[in-house]
C-alpha cells in the first residue's frame, strides 16, 4: 500500500514538473508549469477564488492547488485565458515581465492593493524563469535536480509568505499587465486575450513594501518573483524570516523593474526559520486538503499537443470564452466571503489620466513606476504594454 502511494505521488509530481530538462522545449514546458503553479498557489492562499476553482497536484511531499476553469467562477476562467496569452508571448521569447495585481475598485484597476511581478530572462540556449537569487553565475551548469529542488523551495516560500501576510480586503479584483523585450517584439503583437495598455505606472493604495521571493534557473530560462504589498500586512510576519539588505527601505519610491539594482534595497524572504517552526508543529507540508480527487483539466496543461491523457475537448474548454457577468460567493481560506466577478472590459468605467493625477495629488498615494531606465533616450521611448481585454 505504501509503495503504491509513493508511486502515485511520484507520478503526479512528474505531471507537474518533468524529471529531465535537457532541451529548450522541455525547459519551456517547465517554466510554463512553474508559472501556473506559482500563480495558482498565490491566488489560492490569498483567497482570491473559491475552493471549487482549484484542483490538486502533488510535488514530492507538497500538496499544491492548481487553478482550473470553472463555469461557476468566471474570474478563474478569465485568469486561465490570461495565462494562455502569457504562454504565447513566452514561447515566442517576447515576454519580459508579468504584473499580476489585486485591486478593490472595479472602476479603477490602476489603483492596486497588492501585486506580484514575474520576470523572465532568456539565455542563448533559451529562456529562464528567475526568482531572484544570489547564485546567478552557474546557469549553464544547472542540472535537472537543481532546478526541481529550487522550484520546490520557491513554492514553499510562496506558501509560507502568503500564509503569513495580513488578509486582503473582502472583495477584490485581478488585473494583469505584460511587458516585452521591445527590441525583438513586433510592434503590432498582442497575445490572445490582450490589448494595448497603459505604461504610465499604477497607483498603490497604501504604504507599499517590496519582497524578493526567489529564482529558479534552468539551462535555458530564468524566472523571478517579487511581491509588493501593503506595509501593514507585514506586521504578522516574523522578522526572523526576513533578511533585509538595508533596514531603511525607501517605501515612498518603489520601482517595479530596474533590473537587479533595486534588489539591494529590498527584503529577501527567508523561509528556513518559519519552515522549521511549521515542521515542528505539523508533520506534513500539505497546503490544503490533500485528499481531493482532481480529474479536471488544469492550467498547467497548456500545450495543444500534450500527451494523450489530455483530450482535445479539455483544451478547447481552457480557451473557451466566458463573457457573461456572474457573481458567486464562497468562504475562502482566510474565512472571508469572496465574490468572484468578471465584467466585460468594455463595461468598465474608465478614469481619465487627468483625474487620476489630480486624485493622486490630493490623496498622497504612491505611484509605482513599472519600468525605469537610467538612459534618458529609453525613458523618452514609450515601452509597449499589454493588458487584458476583460478584467476579473
Swiss-Prot record:
It holds the Pfam family HORMA. Phosphorylated at Ser-375 in a SPO11-dependent manner. GO terms for biological process: blastocyst development; homologous chromosome pairing at meiosis; meiotic cell cycle; meiotic DNA double-strand break formation; meiotic recombination checkpoint signaling; meiotic sister chromatid cohesion; oogenesis; regulation of homologous chromosome segregation. GO terms for cellular component: chromosome; condensed nuclear chromosome; nucleus; synaptonemal complex. Residues 271-292, 371-392 are annotated as: Disordered. The modification Phosphoserine is found at residue 374. It is found in: Nucleus; Chromosome. It comes from the Eukaryota. Its main location: nucleus. Residues 25-227 form the HORMA domain. The keyword tRNA processing does not apply. A motif (Nuclear localization signal) lies at residues 381-384. Keywords: Chromosome, Differentiation, Meiosis, Nucleus, Oogenesis, Phosphoprotein, Spermatogenesis. Interacts with HORMAD2. Interacts with IHO1. Plays a key role in meiotic progression. Regulates 3 different functions during meiosis: ensures that sufficient numbers of processed DNA double-strand breaks (DSBs) are available for successful homology search by increasing the steady-state numbers of single-stranded DSB ends. Promotes synaptonemal-complex formation independently of its role in homology search. This is HORMA domain-containing protein 1. It comes from Rattus norvegicus. The lineage of its organism: Eukaryota, Metazoa, Chordata, Craniata, Vertebrata.
Amino acid at each position: 500500500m505504501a509503495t503504491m502511494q509513493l508511486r502515485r505521488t511520484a507520478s503526479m509530481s512528474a505531471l507537474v514538473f518533468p524529471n529531465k530538462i535537457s532541451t529548450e522545449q522541455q525547459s519551456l514546458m517547465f517554466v510554463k508549469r512553474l508559472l501556473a503553479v506559482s500563480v495558482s498557489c498565490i491566488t489560492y492562499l490569498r483567497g482570491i477564488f473559491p475552493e471549487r476553482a482549484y484542483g490538486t497536484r502533488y510535488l514530492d511531499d507538497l500538496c499544491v492547488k492548481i487553478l482550473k476553469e470553472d463555469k461557476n467562477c468566471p474570474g478563474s476562467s478569465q485568469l486561465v485565458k490570461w495565462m494562455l496569452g502569457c504562454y504565447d508571448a513566452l514561447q515566442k521569447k517576447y515576454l519580459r515581465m508579468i504584473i499580476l495585481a489585486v485591486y478593490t475598485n472595479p472602476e479603477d484597476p490602476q489603483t492596486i492593493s497588492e501585486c506580484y511581478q514575474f520576470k523572465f530572462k532568456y539565455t542563448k540556449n533559451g529562456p529562464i524563469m528567475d526568482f531572484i537569487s544570489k547564485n546567478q553565475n552557474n546557469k549553464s551548469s544547472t542540472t535537472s535536480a537543481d532546478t526541481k529542488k529550487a522550484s520546490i523551495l520557491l513554492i514553499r516560500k510562496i506558501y509560507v509568505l502568503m500564509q503569513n501576510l495580513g488578509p486582503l480586503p473582502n472583495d477584490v479584483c485581478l488585473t494583469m499587465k505584460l511587458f516585452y523585450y521591445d527590441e525583438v517584439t513586433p510592434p503590432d503583437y498582442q497575445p490572445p486575450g490582450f490589448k494595448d495598455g497603459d505604461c504610465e505606472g499604477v497607483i498603490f493604495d497604501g504604504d507599499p513594501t517590496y519582497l524578493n521571493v526567489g529564482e529558479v534557473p534552468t539551462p535555458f530560462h530564468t524566472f523571478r518573483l517579487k511581491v509588493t504589498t501593503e506595509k501593514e500586512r507585514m506586521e504578522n510576519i516574523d522578522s526572523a524570516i526576513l533578511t533585509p539588505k538595508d533596514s531603511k527601505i525607501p517605501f515612498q519610491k518603489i520601482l517595479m523593474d530596474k533590473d537587479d539594482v533595486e534588489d539591494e534595497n529590498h527584503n529577501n524572504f527567508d523561509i528556513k526559520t518559519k519552515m522549521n517552526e511549521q515542521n515542528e508543529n505539523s508533520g506534513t507540508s500539505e497546503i490544503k486538503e490533500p485528499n481531493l480527487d482532481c480529474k479536471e483539466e488544469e492550467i498547467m496543461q497548456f500545450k495543444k499537443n500534450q500527451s494523450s491523457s489530455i483530450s482535445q475537448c479539455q483544451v478547447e474548454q481552457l480557451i473557451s470564452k466566458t463573457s457573461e457577468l456572474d457573481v458567486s460567493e464562497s468562504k475562502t481560506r482566510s474565512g472571508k466571503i469572496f465574490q468572484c466577478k468578471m465584467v466585460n472590459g468594455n463595461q468598465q468605467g474608465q478614469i481619465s489620466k487627468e483625474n487620476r493625477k489630480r486624485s493622486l495629488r490630493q490623496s498622497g498615494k504612491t505611484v509605482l513606476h513599472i519600468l525605469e531606465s537610467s538612459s534618458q533616450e529609453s525613458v523618452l521611448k514609450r515601452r509597449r504594454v499589454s493588458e487584458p481585454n476583460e478584467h476579473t
